[in-house]
Amino acid sequence: AGFAKAQGDIVITMDADLQDSPEEIPGLINMITNQQFDLVSGWKKKRYDSVFAKNLPSKLFNWAARKTSGVKLNDFNCGLKAYKNVVVKNIEVSGEMHRYIPVLAKNAGFGKIGEKVVLHQARKYGETKFGMERFINGFLDLITIWFLSRFGKRPMHLFGALGSIMFLIGFLS
């Protein structure tokens, strides 16, 4: 709903827990206005999170997201991002797909995606919502994005091939 209401030329998103510093916003805006990026994502290169509970799963998730999407970001989960308004007006984000906005943008034809190292701070407010359920749902969402980007406009390439294989197996047995 927020993207639909956005009116400025550049749209900024960030988490409410203040682990990302608002002072980073001008740097993101600069990359969009002066370097012509469609979207710039923050990269929490030095993190202040639990190694086993968050850092390692995040590294695994980011590696899988890079491999399946072709988007070369180090930190898909960073909530601090800047977008040209035209980008957010041309993508559909639902459920927990917010972490895949760069992939959705790429699939919508916005391929100039940048990344900027941002300061990550210890959590000041609230508690993390990250857990095993969110980790699993993140990978299921990744599979959904991969499927939609690969077969969304030609689903018969997958279903037709699977149906043909099943038909042949049934015919031959």
Feature names for model-found ranges:
Residues 1-5, 22-100, 104, 121-140, ...:
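Acceptor/aglycone-binding surface of glycosyltransferases and processive sugar-polymer synthases
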Residues 11:
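Short aromatic/hydrophobic "clamp" motif used to bind/position activated sugar donors
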Residues 113-116:
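Conserved alpha/beta core of the MobA/IspD/sugar-nucleotide pyrophosphorylase nucleotidyltransferase superfamily
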